[in-house]
Amino acid sequence: MCLGWHQVTTEQSSKAIYSGISSAGAMNVIAPTWFSLSDNEGNFTSLADSGYVAQAHGAGKKVWGLVDDFKKGIKLSQVLGSTTSRTKLINGLVGKAIQYDLDGINIDFEHVTKDNAAAYLEFLRELTIKAHINELVISVDNYTPAAHNAFYNIKEQGKVVDYVILMAYDEHYQGSEESGSVSSLEFVKNGVASMVASVPKERVVAALPFYTRLWKESKSKGGKPTSQAYGMSAAETILKSHDTTAKWDDTTGQYFAQYKDGGYTYKIWLEEETSLGKKMDEVAKQKVAGFAFWKLGCERPATWSTIQKYCK
């Protein structure tokens, strides 16, 4: 399996299938970010479009609608803890999937806590049962397993849903205490190893980044750096504009570059075809179900040639 997340933010953009789909021959599932929880009573907003689905199916791609919990004020303990609101959400999601002829639903709830984890798992159980009755696939996005997020209970998730997706990125993120790689080779290897230790490998999907971060170091001692996310081509354009050449870094399995501008030091660990290939090579050794990529539009046409070697 090879999934590409398509970030959709407006009704207008939801009507257009990803423009680079012709180059993405290896991709067999596209997941538009169509659904978002809108309150604590089981309602959600929808950007779903039947024309989009028809285009995707015509191109040989299955469509999994993504639902997130990113809106400010959403309290999963209320949404999922109440049988009434939980059932309303499940019926609504499956209803939309049927209405728009979707092939699956991708759950991207990133604000699960220890207090609502049990309700979250019950939501996944009930959703999967109803989804399977209607021949829909359920996948769930997860952080790299660690002690501080053990309550996500990936072992139980693996017994319930069809695919458990490891988001093998954000090793360093906006707000990190120090600059660093978004997804180093060792980070990916360790994350996948942790995941397959708890979830059957045939249900594990490794998600890798098409984006990187340009870090601006703080001038003050002990100050936190700031960063901006860029796609592959944009990152290389920045380096060229500063007459800077990236050099291979064996430690991260990536090309690294740094330069000074306006008295500030900038650092970047590139995500491009070579580093992506090395990560995919390591993941493939674990014989997992497939790969996913965040996000479509940050890659280059040539990137799919690398992906094609592992997604056949």
Model-predicted segments: where are they?
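Acidic/aromatic/glycine-rich contiguous surface patches that form carbohydrate-binding/processing clefts
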Residues: 275-312
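Glycan-binding loop/region signatures in secreted carbohydrate-active enzymes
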Residues: 210-281, 311
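Substrate-binding surface in catalytic domains of secreted glycosidases
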Residues: 39-40, 91, 114-241
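A cross-domain feature marking catalytic cores of carbohydrate-active enzymes
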Residues: 6-8, 34, 65-69, 109-111, ...
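Short acidic, glycine/proline-enriched helix-loop-strand junctions
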Residues: 58-61, 116-118, 122, 127-129, ...
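Short, acidic/polar
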Residues: 9-24, 81-99, 146-154, 270-284
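Glycan-recognition patch characteristic of GH18 chitinases/ENGases
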Residues: 1-92
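Conserved, mostly hydrophobic/aromatic
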Residues: 30, 107, 164, 206, ...
